[in-house]
Amino acid sequence: MARKCEITGKKTMFGNNVPRKGLAKKKGGAGQHIGVKTKRTFKVNLINKKFFIPNLGRSVSIKVSANALRSISKIGLDAFLKKNCKKIENFL
């Protein structure tokens, strides 16, 4: 299964490791020198979480990012799904 949040759609991003050495010019140095850039991945912080749906009377297991889980705990699952244009039936 893909490493992707089922609600927000967040997934692995790609970028570079950029090693820097030297003192910055604004700190009185000769400037920072950048070495060889190497590829890297930024992985999503995913959690398999069970949510209880009271109007259906059952639990649903959803792979959700930590950021989305924080928002769900603040405003509730129904409101968060409505905000992200998702329906609970998609996760059954």
Swiss-Prot record:
Keyword Coiled coil in annotation: no
NCBIfam families: L28 (TIGR00009)
High-level lineage: Bacteria, Pseudomonadati, Spirochaetota, Spirochaetia, Spirochaetales
Entry's transmembrane regions: none
Keywords: Ribonucleoprotein, Ribosomal protein
UniProt KW Ribonucleoprotein keyword: yes
Family matches, as InterPro entries: Ribosomal_bL28, Ribosomal_bL28/bL31-like_sf, Ribosomal_bL28_bact-type, Ribosomal_bL28_sf
Pfam families: Ribosomal_L28 (PF00830)
GO molecular function, one term: structural constituent of ribosome
GO annotation, cellular component aspect: ribonucleoprotein complex; ribosome
Protein name per Swiss-Prot or TrEMBL: Large ribosomal subunit protein bL28
Family: Belongs to the bacterial ribosomal protein bL28 family.
GO biological process: translation
